[in-house]
Curated annotation (Swiss-Prot):
Organism expressing this protein natively: Clostridioides difficile (strain 630) (Peptoclostridium difficile)
SUPFAM superfamilies attached to this UniProt entry: GHMP Kinase, C-terminal domain, Ribosomal protein S5 domain 2-like
Annotated ATP binding sites: 95-105
Keywords (A to Z) from UniProt: ATP-binding, Isoprene biosynthesis, Kinase, Nucleotide-binding, Transferase
Record-linked NCBIfam families: ispE, PRK14608.1
Gene Ontology molecular-function annotations: 4-(cytidine 5'-diphospho)-2-C-methyl-D-erythritol kinase activity; ATP binding
Gene designation: ispE
Name of the protein this chain belongs to: 4-diphosphocytidyl-2-C-methyl-D-erythritol kinase
Record-level GO BP terms: isopentenyl diphosphate biosynthetic process, methylerythritol 4-phosphate pathway; terpenoid biosynthetic process
HAMAP family (UniProt xref): IspE
């Protein structure tokens, strides 16, 4: 086998709470993470020459050693003394810099793909440990199972997520949001409303999507909306079109809404497409990285 093709899925946050800050600048968080069926395709091909090449359909990501997928391949090459090279091609569908872990998901796909391609026989836990060196979201993206994430996001407790037929409307406005600046703008002593994650987990367990939708809280949202009112406007469009609930994912700028039926989600999509290009109707998922082809 010298070629492998993988699906690399996006995530949304059903809640985000920030509990404090570490000495190294990372924050202690508690959040519920949910994979969705919006994915990039990552193709990995072995090369005879000992180098790492990155190519993509997107003009918005670096194609050199600054790309997280390059770093993922380099970590495995160095750790296991691999003398072969690889070409990594990313067919981008997940919006870039959107708060949906697109880059982390791509890195997770490279770790899983090279584990198979190079027959390293690493367990999922071993891959997650390596992935944590690349980013806090990478371990979650490897498995993709809905989880309560704690610590800096690396401590994962599997939970029951949204039913797989849940209709989700996604809108990524053409805005740049600095995650660092959002966290810097957070006043932890003045948070008016925090998520009740225990209650949210119970709502997920009982598949009460209405209660889930009404209980979603992202404490980063007000900081980002303070800089970009547009995010609030998108939420209002979703709610006007019968979303059960709408919230910003991650530090933004992506907004999502949960819908009881697909027809309402599609009507909301049509309205948002009048102003925004990156609008999708997708379902929730229980999967992370998925191998969808191995070739010699």
């Amino acid at each position: 086998m010298d070629f492998i093709r993988l699906k690399s899925r996006a995530k949304i946050n059903l809640s985000i709470d920030v509990l404090g800050k570490r000495q190294d600048g990372y924050h202690f968080v508690e959040m519920i993470m949910q994979t969705i069926d919006l994915y990039d395709i990552v193709k990995i091909k072995e090369l005879d020459e000992d180098e790492i090449k990155v190519k993509s359909t997107s003009l918005d990501i670096p194609l050199d050693e600054d790309n997280i997928v390059y770093k993922a391949a380099k970590i495995l090459k160095n750790k296991f003394y691999i003398k072969k090279g690889v070409e990594i091609f990313i067919e981008k569908n997940i919006p870039v810099a959107a708060g949906m872990a697109g880059g982390s998901s791509n890195a997770a796909a490279v770790l899983v793909g090279l584990n198979h391609l190079w027959e390293l026989r690493l367990s999922e836990d071993e891959l997650k440990e390596i992935g944590l060196n690349l980013g806090a979201d990478v371990p979650f993206c490897i498995s993709g199972r809905p989880a309560l994430a704690q610590g800096i996001g690396e401590k994962l407790t599997n939970i029951k997520g949204l039913p797989c037929d849940t209709n989700i409307l996604i809108c990524k406005p053409d805005l740049f949001v600095s995650t660092k600046e959002v966290y810097q703008g957070l006043d932890l002593n003045n948070i008016k409303k925090r998520p009740n994650n225990k209650y949210l987990i119970e709502c997920l367990k009982s598949e009460d999507i209405k209660a889930v939708s009404e209980s979603m809280v992202n404490i980063l949202e007000n900081v980002t909306i303070g800089k970009h009112k547009e995010i609030s406007d998108i939420k209002q469009v979703m709610m006007k079109n019968n979303a059960l609930g709408s919230m910003m994912s991650g530090s933004g700028p992506t907004v999502f809404g949960l819908f009881k039926n697909k027809e309402d989600a599609l009507i909301g999509k049509k309205e948002l497409l009048k102003k925004y290009k990156q609008v999708y109707v997708v379902n929730s998922s229980q999967k992370g990285v998925e191998i969808c082809g191995e070739f010699n």
